[in-house]
Amino acid sequence: LRRYPRTKVDLQVDSRAVNLVEQRIDLALRITNALEPNLIARRLAACASVVCAAPAYLAAHGTPRRAEDLAAHNCLTYNYFGKSLWQFTRAGADLSVPVGGNLSANESTVLMLATAQGAGISLQPLFAAAPLLAAGQLVALLPDCQPQEMGIHAVYTSRQHMAPALRALLDFLAEWFACDPGWLAASAAAGAPKAPGRGPGGAAERRAKTA
C-alpha cells in the first residue's frame, strides 16, 4: 500500500477455500498441493514444515527418535491437512505416519500456541515456528525426516481483463517471497529452493479484493 497509495485492499482471512466467483474475490493465497483445476494459480514459494514440541512436553513424555514413534505421542493436528496422517520423506522414500491426539483445530496458530505450552507435538509451517524455535520455546524433532512440502499459490479466476491493481499485487507478492530476508532464512533452514521472482526470493487462505 505504501508503493501504491491509491490502491485499497479488502483482506479476509479464513481456513476454508471459498468460491472466488461467488464471493467476488479477486485473488486468494493458498497453501496447498491440491488446487482446483478451474482456477489459475501462480506458485509463489514453497512452504516447509517442522515437527516440534516444547521442552516441557519432551521432558514429561520423552523425545520421539523415529517418525513411527509419533504414534505413542499426543499429536495436535490441523483439521484440513494431516489430521490423522503425516507425510514425510526419509532417505529418499515416502513415509506416511498415523497420528492422533486430544486437540485438533482449523487454525495452525492455535496449535502452535498449545504446542508451546507443552500440550503435545505438532506439525507447523517453518516460517511461523522459526521465532519460537530460535527462542528455545519449541524444539525441532525428527531431523532425518522431511515433512511434505506445500506450495504457496496466488489463485485467481482469469487472466483476461486483469485489473492493473491486481497485476501489481501479483508482481509484488512474487517479489516479496523472492527477496524478504525472513522468508529466505526460513527457506534456507529447511533446504527449500528460493521462489521464482526478481531480486536476490485444505488449505490456509488469504484473499483480497483490490480497488
Tell me what each language-model feature is.
Residues 41-44, 135-147:
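Short beta-strand->loop
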Residues 126-135, 145-211:
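C-terminal effector-binding regulatory domain of bacterial HTH transcription factors
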Residues 38-49, 53-76, 91:
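Flexible hinge/capping segments at coil-to-helix
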Residues 1-40, 188-190, 194, 209-211:
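Central regulatory/effector-binding core of bacterial HTH transcription factors
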Residues 112-137:
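A ligand-binding cleft/hinge motif common to bilobed small-molecule-binding domains
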Residues 9-13, 77, 97-107, 145:
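Short beta-strand-to-loop elements that line the ligand-binding cleft
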Residues 15, 31-34, 53-55, 124-127:
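Beta->alpha turn/N-cap motifs
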Residues 27-30, 120-124, 140-141:
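Paired acidic/hydrophobic, glycine-rich loop segments that form the ligand-binding mouth/hinge
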